[in-house]
C-alpha cells in the first residue's frame, strides 16, 4: 500500500477509515480521541463504544464513522510511554491495526501518530 505523510486535521480526511488513539475505557479522552468523538457525534460514538466494554493496550477495534466522512474508525489502544519496552508495544499497535485493515479490505486510511500524548 503506498503512503503519504500529510499534516492535516484527521477528522477532515477523505478516506475509508481513520485511526483513533483510543482510551482503554469507554470514555472520551484528550487530543485525537476527543477530536474524533466530537466530529463523529460524541453521543452516538460513545453509546456504541459503551457496548464494547474495556480493552487492553494494543487492542484494536472498528466502529462506524458516524458523522465523519469515513466508513470506519479504527480505534487503537496505545500504550503510555514507559521507556524502551514501549517501542515494542507501539510496533504491536501498528501491526494489529494493519491486520484489521487487511481483514476488512480497507483501501485508504489516515493514521495519527500513536502514543505521542495529547
Task: Provide a role label for each language-model segment.
Residues 1-118:
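Macrodomain-like recognition of ADP-ribose-binding/processing modules
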Amino acid at each position: 500500500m503506498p503512503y503519504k505523510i500529510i499534516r492535516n486535521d484527521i477528522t477532515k480526511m477523505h478516506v475509508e477509515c481513520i485511526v483513533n488513539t483510543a482510551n482503554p475505557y469507554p470514555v472520551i479522552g484528550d487530543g485525537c480521541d476527543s477530536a474524533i468523538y466530537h466530529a463523529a457525534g460524541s453521543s452516538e460514538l460513545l453509546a456504541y463504544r459503551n457496548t464494547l466494554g474495556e480493552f487492553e493496550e494494543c487492542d484494536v477495534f472498528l466502529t462506524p464513522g458516524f458523522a465523519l466522512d469515513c466508513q470506519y474508525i479504527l480505534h487503537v489502544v496505545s500504550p503510555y510511554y514507559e521507556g524502551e519496552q514501549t517501542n515494542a508495544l507501539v510496533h504491536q499497535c501498528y501491526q494489529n491495526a494493519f491486520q484489521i485493515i487487511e481483514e476488512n479490505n480497507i483501501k485508504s486510511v489516515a493514521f495519527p501518530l500513536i502514543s505521542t500524548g495529547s
